[in-house]
Amino acid sequence: MVYMREDLPAVARDAASAITRWLEAMPETVSVRDVADDPQYRARHIDLLWTRRTTDGTCTEESIRVRGERYGHTGEYHIEAVSGADETSPESMVATEADYLYYYFLPRAELHILPMQQMRGWLREHGAEMRQLRPPTVLDSADGVEVGRLVSRDRLLREVGGIRVVQIRPRAA
């Protein structure tokens, strides 16, 4: 899939907005902070910080990378890789340093929550099996050329523990 450059901000904005509303509606939420434009977090590919109260009453903060997707029919996730890095090194498999990747399919209002600790381990083991995107399917973004791997959703759901799929109710018009 290839997005036109002008479509990218709208997709990302719509996904982040829907996810933020969903998180804010949860009773355990203390705050949701959009840090996508903060250079400190942008460099680490982190978009949101979610502070929530745990069952024991303490607060915890989770970092989230948001990925918006209009085309849910491919059966694959696009996992961002580190641009310009050695493709075979484990460090190059995933660009984000976030705790979670929230992969949101806009037309279906379906959110896939991928725990990045488990994902990193799985990608270290299996990343070389995944197809890496090459031009012309790489995206020229504000952060440089976006490269990545196409990873089967079905395979990840089978092989990586902790992935959740949530239906987000769209906001009433």
Regions found by a protein language model. Give the residues of each.
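Catalytic cores of nucleic-acid endonucleases
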Residues: 2-9, 66-111
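Short, conserved, surface-exposed binding loops centered on an aromatic residue
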Residues: 40, 49-55, 91-95, 103
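Conserved catalytic cores of phosphodiester-cleaving nucleases, focusing on short active-site segments
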Residues: 48-72
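Non-catalytic C-terminal interaction segments of nucleic acid-processing enzymes
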Residues: 3-7, 21, 55-58, 106-173
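Acidic-basic catalytic patches of nuclease active cores, encompassing PD-(D/E)XK
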Residues: 1-42, 70-73
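Short connector loops at helix/strand junctions that flank enzyme active sites
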Residues: 43-45, 57-61, 74, 95-98
